[in-house]
């Protein structure tokens, strides 16, 4: 993998500086690409979170060709304590050289946050207490490494919210039979996530199953909690 471009290094340094002062408990990782029609829903879901602790949202725009980056910058300027953009000038996903994973890990590490949440730019959260509920549970139950919830599916063709999905598997054996975990609903302990990256190295594997291997890893290393609440929408 080539070294990071200077502009990305500068953006990561900015995030590190902010987090040294802010000391966020949660970092939210949001990847977006050509989501101009949807990204405001995601960003609004972040900035309306009500939490008793500091959190930061890193929005990685992978060189969108529409107005996604402009919208992300606008929110970054309006909510500088919450939204921290990383704006690419060339698409990292298409390189398939591990650059995107490296940037994600570097950004998450720079925050020093205890927990990680994820939500892509075309999905969004609907529960303003999502993070608070999940952090409260994990803080009170240290034997758990991750918590997830239900979500609702949105069908673009009809413009309607339809079935509710997610849960209720919590054990390795149950999850091995079926993945019932929506990524946008998850809160995970950062140290477990980092251990997974170091030990499993998903970036070098040609897996076509999203975050499913991560859920299996977490369930093998700790306990997973399913919270039977709808907290977001998947498009």
PLM features per residue range, with description:
Residues 24-27, 56, 213:
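Cell-envelope/extracellular polymer assembly enzymes that use nucleotide-activated donors
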Residues 40, 66-75:
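Acidic helix N-cap motif at the loop->helix transition within catalytic regions
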Residues 61-70, 90-91, 120:
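A conserved acidic beta->alpha catalytic loop
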Residues 89-111, 133:
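Glycine-rich, basic loop-to-helix element that forms the pyrophosphate-binding segment
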Residues 116:
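Short aromatic/hydrophobic "clamp" motif used to bind/position activated sugar donors
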Residues 128-161:
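Conserved donor NDP-sugar-binding/catalytic core segment of glycosyltransferases
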Residues 149, 165-235:
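Conserved nucleotide-sugar donor-binding catalytic segment
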């Amino acid at each position: 993998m080539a070294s990071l471009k200077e502009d990305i290094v500068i953006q990561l340094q900015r995030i590190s500086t902010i987090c040294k002062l802010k000391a966020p408990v949660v970092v939210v990782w949001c990847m977006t690409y050509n989501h101009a029609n949807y990204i405001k829903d995601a960003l609004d879901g972040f900035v309306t979170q009500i939490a008793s602790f500091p959190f930061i949202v890193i929005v990685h725009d992978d060189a969108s060709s529409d107005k996604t980056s402009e919208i992300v910058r606008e929110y970054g300027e309006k909510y500088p304590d919450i939204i921290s953009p990383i704006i690419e000038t060339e698409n990292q996903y298409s390189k398939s050289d591990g650059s995107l994973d490296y940037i994600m890990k570097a950004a998450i590490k720079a925050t020093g946050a205890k927990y990680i949440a994820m939500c892509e730019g075309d999905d969004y959260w609907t529960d303003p207490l999502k993070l608070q509920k999940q952090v409260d549970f994990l803080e009170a139950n240290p034997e758990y490494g991750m918590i997830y919830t239900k979500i609702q599916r949105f069908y673009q063709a009809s413009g309607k919210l339809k079935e509710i999905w997610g849960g209720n598997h919590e054990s390795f054996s149950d999850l091995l039979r079926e993945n019932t975990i929506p990524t946008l609903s998850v809160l995970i302990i950062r140290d477990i996530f980092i251990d997974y990256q170091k030990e499993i190295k998903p970036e070098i594997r040609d897996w076509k199953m999203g975050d499913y291997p991560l859920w299996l890893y977490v369930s093998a290393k700790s306990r997973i909690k399913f919270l039977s609440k709808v907290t977001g929408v998947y498009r």
